[in-house]
């Protein structure tokens, strides 16, 4: 009986882990407080800083399947843990 109970606990933990989804910040401001749950296949949080004109910066944050590319004068940081793209 104890073996059956232990087996059920292990199976439950494994099944719950398969349903894990990443949570990333998602807003265009420097100081962000909005979160989004990433879709299936999106395993990366990113923060992209675009320099549009001198002294004009644009922040982009969100989820992605792969780390986004950059243009000259852009910076991108990618990570893979919850809310890591601050």
UniProtKB/Swiss-Prot annotation:
Stored SUPFAM superfamilies: Snake toxin-like
Keywords of this entry: Acetylcholine receptor inhibiting toxin, Disulfide bond, Ion channel impairing toxin, Neurotoxin, Postsynaptic neurotoxin, Secreted, Signal, Toxin
Tissue: Expressed by the venom gland.
CDD domains, sorted: TFP_snake_toxin
Keyword Translocase set for record: no
InterPro entries (UniProt xref): Snake_3FTx (IPR003571), Snake_toxin-like_sf (IPR045860), Snake_toxin_con_site (IPR018354), Toxin_cobra-type (IPR054131)
Gene3D superfamilies (UniProt xref): CD59
Protein family membership: Belongs to the three-finger toxin family. Ancestral subfamily. Orphan group II sub-subfamily.
Main function: Binds with low affinity to muscular and very low affinity to neuronal (alpha-7/CHRNA7) nicotinic acetylcholine receptor (nAChR).
Name listed for the protein in its UniProt record: Weak neurotoxin 5
């Amino acid at each position: 009986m104890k073996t059956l109970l232990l087996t059920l606990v292990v199976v439950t933990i494994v099944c719950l882990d398969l349903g894990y989804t990443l949570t990333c910040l998602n807003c265009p401001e420097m100081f962000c407080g909005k979160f989004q749950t990433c879709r299936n296949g999106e395993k990366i949080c990113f923060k992209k800083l675009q320099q549009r004109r001198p002294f004009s910066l644009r922040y982009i944050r969100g989820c992605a399947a792969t780390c986004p590319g950059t243009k000259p004068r852009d910076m991108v940081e990618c990570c893979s843990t919850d809310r890591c793209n601050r």
